[in-house]
Amino acid sequence: MIVIPAIDLKDGACVRLRQGLMEDSTVFSDDPAAMARKWVEQGAKRLHLVDLNGAFAGEPVNGEVVKAIAKAYPNLPIQIGGGIRSLETIKHYLDAGVTYVIIGTKAVKEPEFVKQACDAFPGHIIVGLDAKDGYVATDGWAEVSTVKATDLAKQFAADGVSEIVYTDIARDGMMQGVNIEATVEMARAGNIPIIASGGITNMDDIKGLMAVAHEGITGAITGRAIYEGSLDLAEAQAYCDAQ
């Protein structure tokens, strides 16, 4: 299992939101590329970038920053999410050196788009499923649907998605601990690798996820915890490597 630092981009800066609210953001750095360097130096094996403006605009807004980070680390897998709603955007990011593109809202609203993307760019597509009480949320978490996250996971696994980033939005940015039960349920439902996200606060969460990693949990995304110091990235990754 790899521990993946999140770099959330808003207006060209690296920020962190609480429960996905744009107005409730904390700026951690106005130099996202320097932030990326910091995490790489601490042993990051992949970076998770989110274009927050893009998620709300429905198209890339912080693309230049993403391109700069990808260029600086050509051998480091980078995944990007936020505002990815067309094959053109996916191609744009892959051409810029990004490894994986995360489809979020569009995957839920137009599931057939996921199949098209997987056919066009095999091995590069991740779906981001954000759920609250087991039901999928969309549009920067503004809307909660009547669709069960586990049902979609099965469908996307069949479409050829590489991994699913599963976020429990009730816990994201709240430092309450990760929802291990829901994450395992997702991995079992789709029989597809799951990257856990939302609520990862300290080493207890990393240990808890590692204990069930054999269920198909391949990664853990962490944001606020590593920025505020309740989790040490290097220590967390070293623990996972040693298991």
Swiss-Prot record:
Keyword Transmembrane found: no
Coiled-coil annotated residue ranges, if any: none
InterPro entries assigned to the protein according to its UniProt record, in alphabetical order: Aldolase_TIM, His_biosynth, HisA_bact_arch, Isoase_HisA-like, Isoase_HisA-like_bact, RibuloseP-bd_barrel
Reaction(s) catalysed by this chain's protein: 1-(5-phospho-beta-D-ribosyl)-5-[(5-phospho-beta-D-ribosylamino)methylideneamino]imidazole-4-carboxamide = 5-[(5-phospho-1-deoxy-D-ribulos-1-ylimino)methylamino]-1-(5-phospho-beta-D-ribosyl)imidazole-4-carboxamide
Enzyme Commission identifier(s): 5.3.1.16
Cell location: Cytoplasm
GO cellular component assignments: cytoplasm
Residues annotated as transmembrane: none
Family, similarity comment: Belongs to the HisA/HisF family.
Identification of the protein by name: 1-(5-phosphoribosyl)-5-[(5-phosphoribosylamino)methylideneamino] imidazole-4-carboxamide isomerase
Species whose genome carries this gene: Saccharophagus degradans (strain 2-40 / ATCC 43961 / DSM 17024)
Gene it is expressed from: hisA
